[in-house]
A protein has these predicted regions:
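Glycoside hydrolase catalytic-domain context in secreted enzymes
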Residues: 1-403
Length: 404
């Protein structure tokens, strides 16, 4: 990043620095529970502290903006992105979203630009199908799905990201009424609006733009400042200004907002601020992740008072994750599995008497089919010794595969 930034600024006539962005969703090098888990802590101060640590680690890598937090009210477990949200309650999403923005943008020398997403209604897609339309009443939309944004905007996030979906058959990335009328005029947002991945180009696929050129016009007029990963702005914006189809002042407004974001991050004074700074995956950071994990746990029942487990009693730990390092979950692109301690390693380190059995991983065993495992377990055990060991002990902790 240092080399790219240096070469770019040398070649740029006005020496305007680049801003590097990435998905830092629930930690950077130190990984915390997913946002849905963090919501279970009901501890916004800890959420803010975790975001501040993530900002420090991200800025040390040269990243100065994240596409987080996601505060879509999510009530359909079929929706694949529900793990990024703080759950089903608008108030919890608003409180936790604001706390996360505060954490990301808190410290002058290591802060990163926060991005509220996805504006708006993305969590209400029909049948939980990603990219689907949203059909809800205006009252429900404003009171339930816009409310978290209204709350989190008080923290003054640098960016807001548009949603993929359409409201009343109008895709958000080209929806002037929502982006200018509601977000900017009514809610007072003055920062940068960025599209989601390719969502401007998808205006053509959604049937509201005849071609990519018209998609660029609609998005620009709606107030989208940054076109993420579609060719619409890059290919057509300059031509549209020259032909008079888009006012030059409209492009100037968007450019000004992006420049202001860079200025607020201090990139003009020091485009390398935080780069190479130490503090990644420190013991302090690990302890905060451990604290968050503990506070995120939800005890559903403890009828026979099995918990807490006694360290004096032998316990069987059974399942594929007993010896696995894959505990970082999704959207943890900067986490390293090599840094994770397995359950088996931790038990040995703490000298706790336990036996770990991995068993069969039905999700990644290339030679295994679910119906075969079911048949073998009912007729002839796949591993008789494994089953015998489990049934011999009074206490078994199941550590199954988590699939998202």
């Amino acid at each position: 990043i240092y080399d790219i930034q240096s070469r770019y600024m040398e070649q740029h006539p006005h020496h305007i620095p680049l801003i590097f962005m990435a998905d830092v969703i629930h930690g950077c090098r130190t990984i915390y529970p997913i946002p849905l888990g963090q919501a279970c802590s009901f501890h916004p101060e800890l959420v803010s502290e975790a975001a501040s640590i993530a900002a420090l680690e991200a800025s040390s890598e040269g990243l100065r903006a994240t596409f987080s937090p996601m505060i879509d009210v999510s009530r359909d477990p079929r929706w694949g992105r529900i793990m990024e949200s703080f759950g089903e309650d608008p108030y919890v999403n608003g409180i936790m979203g604001k706390a996360m923005v505060d954490g990301y943008q808190q410290k002058a020398d290591t802060k990163i630009a926060a991005c509220l997403k996805h504006f708006a209604g993305y969590g209400a897609v029909n049948a939980g199908r990603d990219y689907n339309d949203v059909e809800i009443s205006q009252r429900t939309f404003l009171e339930q799905y816009v409310k978290p944004f209204r709350m989190a905007l008080k923290a003054k996030p640098a960016m807001v990201m548009t949603a993929f979906n359409a409201i009343d058959r109008k895709p958000i990335s080209g929806n002037k009424e929502l982006l200018k009328g509601l977000l900017r005029d009514m809610e007072g947002f003055e920062g940068t609006v960025i599209s989601d991945w390719g969502s401007i180009g998808q205006l053509e696929e959604q049937g509201v733009a005849a071609d990519m050129e018209e998609a660029a016009i609609q998005a620009s007029e709606a107030g989208v400042d940054i076109d993420m990963m579609s060719p619409a702005y890059m290919m057509y914006l300059e031509k549209l200004v020259e032909s008079g189809k888009i006012p030059e002042a409209l492009v100037d407004e968007s450019a000004f907002r992006v420049l202001m974001m860079k200025n607020q991050l201090g990139l003009f004074e020091n485009p390398f601020a935080g780069l190479g700074k130490s503090g990644k995956l420190t013991q302090h950071n690990r302890e905060k992740a451990y604290q968050m994990a503990g506070e995120s746990c939800v005890l559903l029942k403890n009828e026979k008072k099995i918990l807490p487990l006694s360290v004096k009693k032998k316990v069987i730990w059974a399942g594929p994750y007993t010896a696995s390092r894959e505990f970082l979950s999704r959207w943890s692109i900067f986490g390293e599995h090599e840094s994770v301690e397995t359950i088996e390693e931790v038990l040995q380190k703490k000298q706790i008497e336990a036996e770990c059995i991995t068993g069969c991983n039905i999700l990644s065993d290339a030679e295994c089919k679910v119906w075969q495992v079911e048949q073998e377990l009912s007729d002839k055990p796949r591993d008789e010794q494994w089953l015998e060991t489990i049934t011999r002990e009074d206490t078994v902790v199941c550590v199954p595969v988590s699939y998202t």
